Every structure is written in C-alpha cells, then in structure tokens.
Amino acid sequence: MQNATLISVFVASLVIGITAYAIFVSFGPSARNLRDPFEEHED
C-alpha cells in the first residue's frame, strides 16, 4: 500500500507542477513577449 501512495503523490505533484509552469508561462513576466496570432490578423 505504501508503494501505491508514493506513486499517487508523485503523479499528483507532477500534474500540479506542470500546471503551475503553464500558468507561469501564460501570465508571468515573459508573457509580454508572446505573440497573439488573432491580433495580427484582424479583419
């Protein structure tokens, strides 16, 4: 049972880490350098 708990905690922390990194990239300080393709092609 201890092995299953360890794997569950690892997978949960991995998912939380990837989500936190994606939010940081989207809204962090470097987000100003990201281009928006919808703004480039306004009709």
From Swiss-Prot:
Transmembrane segments: 5-25
InterPro entries per record: PSII_PsbN (IPR003398)
Membrane topology note: Single-pass membrane protein
GO biological process: photosynthesis
GO CC terms, sorted: chloroplast thylakoid membrane
Cell compartment(s), UniProt: Plastid, Chloroplast thylakoid membrane
Keywords tagged on the record: Chloroplast, Membrane, Plastid, Thylakoid, Transmembrane, Transmembrane helix
Protein origin, superkingdom: Eukaryota
Alphabetical list of PANTHER family matching this protein: PROTEIN PSBN
Entry's family note: Belongs to the PsbN family.
Role: May play a role in photosystem I and II biogenesis.
UniProt-recorded name of the protein: Protein PsbN
Source species of the chain: Cyanidioschyzon merolae (strain NIES-3377 / 10D)
Organism ancestry: Eukaryota, Rhodophyta, Bangiophyceae, Cyanidiales, Cyanidiaceae
GN (gene name): psbN
